Amino acid sequence: MQYTRNTTMTKTDRDTLRSLHGRKKWEHIWAYYKLPLAIVLIIVYILGYAAYRHVTKKEDVLYLGLVNITAGSDLTEQLTTGFAEAQGLTKKQQVDLLSGLLLSESEHAEEQYVYASEMKLLGAVSAQRLDVVLMDEYARDRLLADDYFLDLRTLDASFHALSGLNAGGTVLDISDTPFVRQAGFSGRVYLGVVQNAPHPERAAAYIHYLFQR
């Protein structure tokens, strides 16, 4: 009985559709098929969006963090795109920049912002989304006390000869490197590579890049 009833309904609908013309015919088609059409459109959108994300997704080849320092547009370009070009990277590869991190309270950063920065920094390290840190003297001392950085000499034996390296080999003064010197920072700028850096070889290449003439 159920099968006969469904067949009759389908035939009735077809007969109705044949009797309609013009706009009413299209309105009937839309009323009858709008749900399946909507489902198909949603599926097409999801598949298209997934394909778009796959094609345009960037690969992060180095994670760079700025702590207690701010880079202008020119320096930011040199620290990110400039390095990517020097390395001959593809357009789908990039340096991921984590900026705006402040570990000391000032007129521009209240206690809550400093706390949020600390959590953001800790989260990036825990998730292995941080390689190189550029920082001021205060941030250097804070992060050194928390044993954030590895010995840079383990990345490249030639780093033993760097004059700006601290006694432990964990922090490098990069204030006199070409890009940083041109930026005109009021204080010294330091570099460290975190202990669990996901791209240590790229971090070593980054240090060489900063010292290039």
Predicted regions and their residues:
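N-terminal Lys/Arg-rich, disordered targeting/topogenic segments
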Residues: M1-E27
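Solvent-exposed loop/turn segments at secondary-structure junctions
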Residues: I69-S73, Y138-R142, A197-P198
